[in-house]
Amino acid sequence: MLEVERLEVGYGALAALHGVSLTVRPGETVALVGPNGAGKSTLLKAIAGLLAPRAGLVRWEGTPLTGEPAHRIVERGVALVPEGRRLFARMTVRENLELGAFTRRAQAEKEGRLARIYEIFPRLRERDRQLSGSLSGGEQQMLALGRALMGGPRLLLLDEPSLGLAPRVVETIFGILRQLHGEGISLFLVEQNVQAALTLAQRAYLLEGGRVVGEGEGRILLQDEHVRAAYLGPLARRG
């Protein structure tokens, strides 16, 4: 289980997170929604070891992650799929995937894991030797997911996986996330498509101004007046 306890994170004099506490249970999909600038991406980066908290604790499977380097957190079974994909454009699909298999165990199982990624994402197999910079946005998101999966995570941190994608491609990506959830991988999802996120998630947290201001089941939050007014637009407010 992922446990975040009273986490404080900032940038210089600017405080971004104020005592954030939340949990993600084994095999659970949890969404984190909120306005731009609320601190959602900051929280994911702090969990993944890319930002050092000022106070508080991140615990995974009963052991603290706080202060661990990012590569050690991946070895522990937690992987981040960053906003904007963060691929190496001049490297091939296969080379980008192989970068995700940097732990000792992943290296030993690299070929089997590659085969599994190509089973999940057949379009990546078709583009195995293609430069990642020439892929479509949807294919690049599949590659970013695949690279994270090469490390064999038990928890995926997903930062805006639908950003910039056409609706049909978003459906494909979320279908893959449902498949991964069905395989027992825990998902902690930051997503600007609130409708899709709350439909996918068993539970969700609302983050505003760096503070958790609400929590509940995804399907129930979809009907919440504040959530509908703030995040689902005028059509939702009228409906």
Which residue ranges define each predicted feature?
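ABC-type ATPase nucleotide-binding domains, specifically the catalytic core motifs of the NBD
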Residues: 12, 68, 93-112, 120-122, ...
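Conserved ABC transporter NBD signature motif
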Residues: 56-64, 76, 109-114
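Conserved ABC ATPase signature
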Residues: 131-135, 139
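The feature captures the beta-strand-to-loop junction immediately N-terminal to the Walker
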Residues: 33-35
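ABC ATPase C-loop
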Residues: 148-149
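Helix-to-loop junction immediately C-terminal to a conserved catalytic motif
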Residues: 48
